[in-house]
Amino acid sequence: MLISQRPTLSEETVAENRSRFVIEPLEPGFGYTLGNSLRRTLLSSIPGAAVTSIRIDGVLHEFTTVPGVKEDVTDIILNLKGLVVSSDDDEPVTMYLRKQGPGVVTAGDIVPPAGVTVHNPDMHIATLNDKGKLEVELVVERGRGYVPAVQNKASGAEIGRIPVDSIYSPVLKVTYKVEATRVEQRTDFDKLIIDVETKNSISPRDALASAGGTLVELFGLARELNADSEHIEIGPSPAEADHIASFALPIDDLDLTVRSYNCLKREGVHTVGELVARTESDLLDIRNFGQKSIDEVKIKLHQLGLSLKDSPATFDPSEVAGYDAATGTWTSDAGYDLDDNQDYAETEQL
């Protein structure tokens, strides 16, 4: 785009899970091109987690009731579709719900395994009378978009296993509009305004970053076309392929200290790709994430040939105070003892 001013992106927080993003200036017409692409990607292609099947003790199919439970099984399934969960595991995981009446059963009564979080614990599931008892086994998987129950029905599944419609998308609503903006003497450039509302499992900022990353990978196919080349190869170069593979790595593979790892996980950063989309300023805004944690992250990314969004290309790990680049270890005067992070982890759990 022949614009003398580089486009910028700003964010305005509207509500807890809703933000308004402004991208300007864009060439005339590009506001709708970019806005439509981002909206469709946000609504259909952001990965998330959802319940794919359940098994209720004493129940063989969904067209029945559970003794002592006000809601029938169909109502319970409908309620469980509203469960907002996130999972760090790419493989199916199992959660358990066990509740004895009388009382109300909520999502907070579900016991998730490590790496799985229930984000709406107050959600109503069922109501039990004095003799009511509810035991449910829930399978959670990661995916994209919407998958009907019929596709979640596994061949050879155990008797009593009930498949559930899965709504993986963590994005609830996306709207956009394009307004005119001025660049020097021209007033016909585009200003794109995108309003994004998400579930509690992801922030609007992270959702937009994920959508942008998906589009960059797809548009990279067209960038590979070169009319001067004798042979046109569709796909990323070997170096770019390595980077793309690195983006998909979980941050667990960076072998970060407990302090840095816990802070990033709490912020919703699960992959290297989500990490490199952040600036140093973004990371410093995270509670308990200081400059030494920034240095540690930059060093780990440098080992993969990557960097934070605003890190200079000339970054040299040997210039980081307290870090021995030759041995890959921190000295005792590094600002905080990296071996003492277990105390930090225990404090975080209190």
Swiss-Prot record:
Domain-related comment: The N-terminal domain is essential for RNAP assembly and basal transcription, whereas the C-terminal domain is involved in interaction with transcriptional regulators and with upstream promoter elements.
Q: Does the keyword Transcription apply?
A: yes
Q: Which GO terms describe its cellular component?
A: cytoplasm; DNA-directed RNA polymerase complex
Annotated protein name in UniProt: DNA-directed RNA polymerase subunit alpha
Q: Which GO terms describe its molecular function?
A: DNA binding; DNA-directed RNA polymerase activity; protein dimerization activity
Where is the stretch described as Alpha N-terminal domain (alpha-NTD)?
Answer: 1-226
What is the annotated role of this protein in its UniProt record? DNA-dependent RNA polymerase catalyzes the transcription of DNA into RNA using the four ribonucleoside triphosphates as substrates.
Gene3D superfamilies in the record: 5' to 3' exonuclease, C-terminal subdomain, DNA-directed RNA polymerase, insert domain, RNA polymerase, RBP11-like subunit
Q: Where is this region: Alpha C-terminal domain (alpha-CTD)?
A: 241-350
Name its species: Mycolicibacterium smegmatis (strain ATCC 700084 / mc(2)155) (Mycobacterium smegmatis)
Where composition is biased (Acidic residues), the residues are 336-350
* UniProt cross-references to InterPro entries, sorted A to Z: DNA-dir_RNA_pol_insert (IPR011262), DNA-dir_RNA_pol_RpoA/D/Rpb3 (IPR011263), DNA-dir_RpoA (IPR011773), RBP11-like (IPR036603), RNAP_asu_C (IPR011260), RNApol_insert_sf (IPR036643)
What gene is behind this protein? rpoA
